[in-house]
UniProtKB/Swiss-Prot annotation:
Annotated compartments: Secreted
Enzyme class: hydrolase
Glycan-modified residues: N231
Family indicated by similarity: Belongs to the peptidase S1 family. Tryptase subfamily.
Single GO BP term: proteolysis
Cited Gene3D superfamilies: Trypsin-like serine proteases
UniProt catalytic activity: Preferential cleavage: Arg-|-Xaa, Lys-|-Xaa, but with more restricted specificity than trypsin
Residue ranges constituting the Peptidase S1 domain according to the UniProt record: 29-270
Cystine residue pairs: C57-C73, C153-C228, C186-C209, C218-C246
Protein name: Tryptase-2
Signal peptide: 1-18
Length: 273
């Protein structure tokens, strides 16, 4: 989207935007429940160096040596591989951590703010992981997959359980089922109550919307996977990106649409493990 349109959108969102403590980026699961062990074997906790290796975002294993996440999770102040670790096979945060080092951090070159799209990044692990029942890559969709409206999909993460209410100990992985919302409907919903002209799109072509009032991702879930079962196979439809608050009426969660970036992903990630 052109800088001018982005500026117009940001100006119109001032009154509706979250307070400083409620960034547009997503961080937690609302309206969901604790995920059964090993149900989502591709789920990743992305950690950043702090007083300890703190959970920053979610992510997904898409190859034994590659993790997919959101670009806003790794920048702009964090760019070096040594700034990050990855945790797989984790049901509860910080319990029996076995953190894996990263060798490459690759944000999409067109990313500069979540509202403008391209909110996607790749992390290469120093070594491939061993695949097991508990650790498996998620399947990426074919370019032709559209994920039609009302498809029931799942989003997972360790984010907030309500607006401004962090996930309490023992920090279990949460899951929630969310319906896909057609992009034009999602865009109309986001314009509702704003002064932004309807000719200025809020939802981008490379976005995918999902969720309704009471069921959504939230702060801390950013970068995590939105998965949909198609013909018996779990496909990653989106990467948790942004939204206005969490689980608000007329404010579905906004995801990066994986099919928009398959060519870019496969510049780096082998299509066969």
């Amino acid at each position: 989207m052109l800088h001018l349109l982005a500026l117009a959108l940001l100006l119109s969102l001032v009154s509706a935007a979250p307070a400083p403590g409620q960034a547009l980026q997503r961080s937690g699961i609302i309206g969901g429940k604790e995920a059964p062990g090993s149900r989502w074997p591709w789920q990743v906790s992305l950690r950043v160096r702090d007083q300890y290796w703190r959970h920053q975002c979610g992510g997904s294993l898409i190859h034994p040596q590659w993790v997919l996440t959101a670009a806003h999770c790794i920048g702009p102040e964090l760019q070096e591989p040594s700034d990050f670790r990855v945790q797989l096979r984790e049901q509860h945060l910080y319990y029996q951590d076995r953190l894996l080092p990263i060798s490459r951090v690759i944000p999409h070159p067109h990313y500069y703010m979540v509202e403008n799209g391209a909110d996607i990044a790749l992390l290469q692990l120093e070594e491939p992981v061993s695949i097991s029942r508990h650790v498996q890559p998620v399947t990426l969709p074919p370019a032709s997959e559209t994920f039609p409206p009302e498809s029931q999909c799942w989003v997972t993460g360790w984010g907030d359980v309500d607006n401004g209410r962090p996930l309490p100990p023992p920090y279990p992985l949460k899951q929630v089922k969310v319906p896909i919302v057609e992009n034009s409907v999602c865009d109309w919903k986001y314009h509702s109550g704003l002064s932004t002209d309807y000719s200025v799109p809020i939802v981008q072509e490379d976005n995918l919307c999902a969720g309704d009032g009471g069921r959504d991702s939230c702060q801390g879930d950013s970068g995590g996977p939105l998965v949909c079962k198609v013909n018996g196979t779990w496909l990653q439809a989106g990467v948790v990106s942004w939204g206005d608050g969490c689980a608000k009426p007329n404010r579905p969660g906004i995801y990066t649409r994986i099919t928009s970036y398959l060519d870019w992903i496969h510049q780096y990630v082998p299509q066969e493990p």
